[in-house]
Amino acid sequence: MLQPKRTKFRKQFKGRIHGVAKGGTELNFGEFGLKAVEPERVTARQIEAARRALTRHMKRAGRVWIRVFPDVPVSAKPTEVRMGKGKGAPEYWAARIKPGRIMFEIDGVSVETAREALTLAAAKLPIKTRFIQRIAE
């Protein structure tokens, strides 16, 4: 699973996801992509599950690019522990996704295969997404 090799601080504020994506809104690598429509935190496990669904459907044909990286540590307190006594330990890593962000790109497959594969990947994610295609020049 994806996670940073090292970070400056162990814990972060929860934060809010405001506005739309500034960068990463265009297809840069592949012919087809999956674009986020709503803001949400996506965990490293969800990204990995979507990647597996993509590659499994494509049957090792084509190429996949993951355009998001989980760099936000999400902390949680153990179950049945009373409130207080400090913030919990980092539990998992997440990526803050803004609307308009390209999450996955694929290339080297047909339009039908790409659409089906990205639909399967989208089912593994907690956000609404849209299938996008590079406009032929």
UniProtKB/Swiss-Prot annotation:
Pfam families in the cross-refs: Ribosomal_L16
Listed InterPro entries: Ribosomal_uL16, Ribosomal_uL16_bact-type, Ribosomal_uL16_CS, Ribosomal_uL16_dom, Ribosomal_uL16_sf
GO terms (BP aspect): translation
GO CC field: cytosolic large ribosomal subunit
Gene3D superfamilies hit by this protein: Ribosomal protein L10e/L16
Keyword annotations from UniProtKB, A to Z: Ribonucleoprotein, Ribosomal protein, RNA-binding, rRNA-binding, tRNA-binding
GO molecular function: rRNA binding; structural constituent of ribosome; tRNA binding
UniProt key word DNA-binding: no
Family (UniProt): Belongs to the universal ribosomal protein uL16 family.
Job description of the protein: Binds 23S rRNA and is also seen to make contacts with the A and possibly P site tRNAs.
HAMAP family membership: Ribosomal_uL16
Quaternary structure and partners: Part of the 50S ribosomal subunit.
Protein name per Swiss-Prot or TrEMBL: Large ribosomal subunit protein uL16
Gene behind this protein: rplP
